[in-house]
From Swiss-Prot:
Family: Belongs to the ATPase delta chain family.
InterPro entries on file: ATP_synth_OSCP/delta_N_sf (IPR026015), ATPase_OSCP/d_CS (IPR020781), ATPase_OSCP/dsu (IPR000711)
Protein known as: ATP synthase subunit delta
PROSITE patterns in the cross-refs: ATPASE_DELTA
Any one cellular-component term (Gene Ontology): proton-transporting ATP synthase complex
UniProt keyword list: ATP synthesis, Cell membrane, CF(1), Hydrogen ion transport, Ion transport, Membrane, Transport
Localization per record: Cell membrane
Keyword Membrane recorded: yes
Transmembrane parts of this sequence: none
Source organism of this protein record: Clostridium botulinum (strain Eklund 17B / Type B)
Recorded topology in the membrane: Peripheral membrane protein
Keyword Iron recorded: no
Cited function: F(1)F(0) ATP synthase produces ATP from ADP in the presence of a proton or sodium gradient. F-type ATPases consist of two structural domains, F(1) containing the extramembraneous catalytic core and F(0) containing the membrane proton channel, linked together by a central stalk and a peripheral stalk. During catalysis, ATP synthesis in the catalytic domain of F(1) is coupled via a rotary mechanism of the central stalk subunits to proton translocation. This protein is part of the stalk that links CF(0) to CF(1). It either transmits conformational changes from CF(0) to CF(1) or is implicated in proton conduction.
Quaternary structure and partners: F-type ATPases have 2 components, F(1) - the catalytic core - and F(0) - the membrane proton channel. F(1) has five subunits: alpha(3), beta(3), gamma(1), delta(1), epsilon(1). F(0) has three main subunits: a(1), b(2) and c(10-14). The alpha and beta chains form an alternating ring which encloses part of the gamma chain. F(1) is attached to F(0) by a central stalk formed by the gamma and epsilon chains, while a peripheral stalk is formed by the delta and b chains.
Length: 179
């Protein structure tokens, strides 16, 4: 429901970071702040608590982050506190990362195999998909012995499942339909 709003916040912050040449710095700082919010229970409770005033929450953020992060980024966080959206910072970060990938003409993908890929196999797969999508692709690799063999590739919403496990499932489904 708030995806559009998250994207607008993220785009505004991205444009500020881009003008300052600090996109990577902002992204890294946001990741660390999200981890702090998500992993520090006391901090989370303070910023979540409805009886702690917005003013006190802002003072807390200023005392923690002043001189540690860029002023514009701190101002952004204070706006989120003001709008009661700070607990949804992760969504803004996710959108900002998507914008960054779009600007860099890059997609994310995953390659799953039953055994680790050799570097030349990985390079060949990456080259094939970069040509197909005409974009750079950042692949994560994962070894899943349950696949038995073959390769599973997902780029965006596109999936190519050429694993032994999927072929066995297809044969099983076909045999069950014939009964």
């Amino acid at each position: 429901m708030y995806e559009y709003l998250d994207r607008r916040y993220a785009l505004a912050l991205y444009q500020v970071a881009e003008k300052k040449g600090k996109v990577d710095e902002y992204l890294q700082d946001l990741r660390e702040i999200c981890e702090l919010i998500e992993n520090n229970h006391e901090f989370y409770e303070v910023i979540k608590h409805p009886q702690i005033s917005t003013k006190k929450k802002k003072k807390t953020f200023i005392s923690i982050f002043k001189d540690k992060i860029d002023e514009e980024l701190l101002s952004f966080l204070l706006i989120l506190i003001e709008k009661d959206r700070i607990l949804y910072l992760r969504e803004k970060l996710n959108e900002m990362e998507k914008i960054d990938l779009e600007r860099k003409n890059t997609l994310k993908g995953i390659i799953k195999t039953a055994i680790p890929l050799l570097s030349n196999e990985f390079d060949n797969l990456r080259d094939i998909f970069q040509k197909k999508y005409d974009k750079n692709i950042l692949f994560e690799t994962e070894v899943d012995r349950n696949l038995l063999g073959g390769v599973y590739v997902r780029v965006g919403h596109d999936v190519i499942d050429d694993t032994v496990k999927s072929k066995i499932e297809e044969m099983k489904d076909l045999m069950l339909k014939q009964k």
